[in-house]
């Protein structure tokens, strides 16, 4: 009888496993449309619209959308802090115009501050959005007082998964975009950037991109007109890709400067599809020499490929005596460690400034010069193509002429 009861129990359990009850899942009622906010513009430059934008960020900054409509103008007379954004989408289809108040901006780091933000999209979907740094007064003041400290237009420090796209950025008092503080996964795409002075004073120090301590930064489909580095790869930049960029009037795409007062490194850089117009150089590396308070510079796994040179002074340049004169560097030679530097597929014509020289490769005698060059088809206006070299490897890939400096 006991055995019969046990068999009956097992049978009932087996039946239970064979025909489990179905669980019906109701639709998730917690999914909501993104909150959308449109800040109220004050209407003229006497009203600072930053408080209204900050209020919109408080309401919609956590996963919502903030819209600046096409045809609208917002006057920003103070720093715009986007710290309240978390996975928010800021769509600039109108004009954000900063005040030119040189007293207010003196010594400030940023006009737009993005500090430890995750998931920001700052973009224009229509391509009509403009961020105007209104930097003319700052350039004019700096021309007479080089100690005047000017802010960066967009300053990113820390954070991750940031997208800046589709916008026009114009006339920053200083640098256009800066990335540092360990930021990661930052994408700049489809940007038009220009700094044009209406006076005889040039838009000094208007780097397009200063990329410092960060990883996985991408710059793609960008046009820059400025008066300093188009892209500056600063200390501790790592895994940076620049793909399809046009730079006019710049100091080129530069690694550095490095080693001014500490040991600095830049590594894992890939630059391709660059058109360099009226630049002091198309691409290059700038390192301080040894001695004094200078540190050691390490540059590794850097590729410059598919460059078109149009009236730029040098196609490629390495400076191992940056920031010092020749006498200093005779006593304190360059000690930068350059490894796996690839320069390939350069074409075009330089300016006549250094004709017949098209490149100046001055590696430090106390460092390493791991550089290879291939597909280098750049000529001076005379039709000649002379490359000045110092302390370069025998298998560099181009015919060298002695006399490199810098």
Swiss-Prot record:
EC number(s) reported in the record: 3.2.1.-
Alphabetical list of InterPro entries matching this protein: Glyco_hydro_28, PbH1, Pectin_lyas_fold, Pectin_lyase_fold/virulence
SUPFAM superfamilies in UniProt: Pectin lyase-like (SSF51126)
UniProt-annotated location(s): Secreted
An example Gene Ontology biological process: cell wall organization
Active site: 228, 251
One GO CC annotation: extracellular region
Protein's name in the database: Probable endo-xylogalacturonan hydrolase A
Species annotation: Aspergillus niger (strain ATCC MYA-4892 / CBS 513.88 / FGSC A1513)
Underlying gene: xghA
């Amino acid at each position: 009888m006991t055995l019969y009861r046990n068999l009956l129990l097992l049978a009932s359990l087996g039946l239970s496993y064979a025909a489990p009850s179905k669980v019906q899942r109701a639709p998730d009622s917690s999914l909501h449309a993104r909150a959308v906010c449109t800040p109220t513009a004050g209407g003229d430059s006497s009203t600072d619209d930053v408080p209204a934008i900050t209020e919109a960020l408080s309401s919609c900054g956590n996963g919502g959308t903030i819209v600046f409509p096409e045809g609208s103008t917002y006057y920003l007379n103070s720093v715009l802090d986007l710290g309240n954004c978390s996975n928010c989408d800021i769509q600039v289809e109108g004009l954000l115009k900063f005040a030119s108040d040189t007293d207010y901006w003196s010594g400030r780091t940023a006009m737009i501050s993005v500090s430890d933000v995750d998931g920001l999209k700052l973009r224009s979907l229509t391509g009509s959005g403009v961020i105007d740094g209104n930097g003319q007064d700052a350039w004019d003041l700096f021309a007479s007082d080089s100690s005047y400290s000017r802010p960066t237009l967009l300053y990113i420090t820390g954070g991750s998964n940031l997208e800046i796209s589709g916008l026009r950025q114009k006339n920053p008092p200083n640098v256009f975009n800066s990335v540092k503080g360990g930021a990661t996964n930052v994408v700049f795409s489809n940007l038009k950037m220009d700094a044009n002075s209406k006076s005889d004073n040039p838009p000094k120090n208007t780097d397009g991109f200063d990329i410092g301590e960060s990883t996985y930064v991408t710059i793609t489909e960008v046009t820059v007109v400025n008066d300093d580095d188009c892209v500056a790869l600063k200390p501790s930049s790592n895994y940076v890709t620049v793909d399809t960029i046009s730079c006019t009037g710049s100091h080129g795409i530069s690694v550095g400067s490095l080693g001014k007062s500490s040991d600095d490194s830049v590594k894992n850089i890939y630059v391709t599809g660059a058109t360099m117009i009226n630049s002091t150089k198309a691409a290059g590396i700038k390192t301080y020499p040894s001695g004094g308070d200078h540190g050691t510079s390490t540059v590794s796994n850097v590729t410059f490929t598919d460059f078109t040179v149009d009236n730029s002074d040098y196609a490629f340049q390495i400076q191992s005596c940056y920031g010092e004169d020749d006498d200093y560097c005779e006593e304190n030679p360059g000690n930068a460690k350059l490894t796996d530097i690839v320069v390939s597929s350069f074409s075009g014509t330089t300016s006549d400034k250094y004709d017949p020289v098209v490149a100046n490769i001055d590696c430090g005698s106390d460092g390493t010069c791991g550089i290879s060059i291939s597909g280098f088809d750049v000529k001076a206006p005379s039709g000649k193509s002379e490359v000045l070299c110092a302390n370069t490897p025998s298998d560099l890939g181009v015919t060298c002429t002695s006399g490199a400096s810098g």
